[in-house]
Structures are given as C-alpha cells and as structure tokens.
C-alpha cells in the first residue's frame, strides 16, 4: 500500500494536484482509521502532494478528537467531510441531526485559522432523494456556521 501511495503521489506531483488520503472507520478499513495512521503514512511517504483529510465520523465513532487531525497533521490537513453521526454508529446524518458537536468544531476551526476545503457528505439514508436532503443539510449547515460566528 505504501508503495502504491508513493507511486500515486509521484504521479500527482507531475500533474500538480493533491492525492488526499482519508481515514475511514474500522468498519470500512483496517489501514487508515485514525489521525496517527495518516501521520505514519506521511512519515513514510514524504511527498507534499500526498495530504490527509478528516471525515468527522471516524474519529467520533472511535472516541478520537476531531481536532487531533488538525494538531497532528498540521499543514497536511487539507480537507474535511462534514456530516453528523450518532454515538457508536458510522451512520452519516445531516449536520445538526446527530450527536457530533459540529457548532463547537466549526468555532475551533475558525479559531485555529483553518482555510482549506470542506464538503457536506450525504450518503446511505439520503440516496433516494438527494435534492431534498441536500437542501436541508445546507440550511442546517448555514445555521450552525452562523451560531459558530463564521458567517
């Protein structure tokens, strides 16, 4: 796997694009499931075009700090999947409809000056009517961002 990521990273460098590696839940993967796994990968694959991201459900499910990704990955922390979840489950819920403290996370992201990308991730429960759920997710996210003082 390390060799493959090195090769993909070298190719990404030639194209001047980033290869973004996502830690998944233990239900989805046994390779990269925590921030420390990504730190170890970046130690072994020293390539500025290989970066990491945080889908906030995996750390939440594993009782790992979401903000640890920012602390541990530093400038390699390049993207976020913002979604909500419930304790002990990897089910992805619309932001604001689960137990993840998203408003507080947004406040902390603002406080540390995170200025890279983030997307809302809608999967599983929302596949049949994505337009309905996307609108609700965007509306909820706008409200959470306003409460966190971002907009």
Regions found by a protein language model. Name each.
Residues 2-6, 14, 110, 115, ...:
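Structural motif corresponding to the early beta-alpha repeats
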Residues 28-35, 39, 58-115, 123-132:
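Gly/Pro-rich active-site loop or hairpin
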Residues 129-151:
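C-terminal helical cap(s) of enzyme catalytic domains, especially alpha/beta-barrels
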Residues 3-10, 14, 36-40, 44, ...:
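Alpha-helical scaffolding segments of alpha/beta enzyme cores, especially the outer helices
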Residues 19-21, 50-54, 78-82, 116-121:
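Hydrophobic faces of well-ordered beta-strands that scaffold small-molecule active sites
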Residues 1-51, 63, 151:
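Active-site acidic/histidine proton-transfer and metal-coordination neighborhood
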């Amino acid at each position: 796997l390390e060799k493959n990521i090195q090769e993909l990273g070298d190719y990404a460098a030639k194209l001047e694009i980033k290869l973004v590696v996502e830690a998944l839940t233990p239900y989805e993967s046994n390779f990269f499931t925590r921030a420390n796994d990504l730190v170890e990968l970046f130690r072994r694959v020293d390539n500025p075009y290989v970066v990491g991201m945080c889908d906030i459900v995996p750390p939440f499910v594993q009782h790992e700090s979401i903000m640890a990704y920012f602390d541990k990955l530093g400038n390699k922390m390049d993207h976020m999947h913002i979604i909500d979840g419930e304790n002990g489950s990897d089910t992805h819920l619309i932001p604001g409809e689960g137990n993840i403290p998203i408003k507080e996370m947004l406040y902390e992201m603002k406080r540390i000056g995170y200025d890279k990308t983030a997307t809302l991730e809608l999967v599983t429960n929302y596949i049949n009517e994505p337009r309905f759920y996307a609108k609700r997710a965007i509306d909820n996210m706008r409200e959470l961002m306003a409460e966190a003082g971002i907009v």
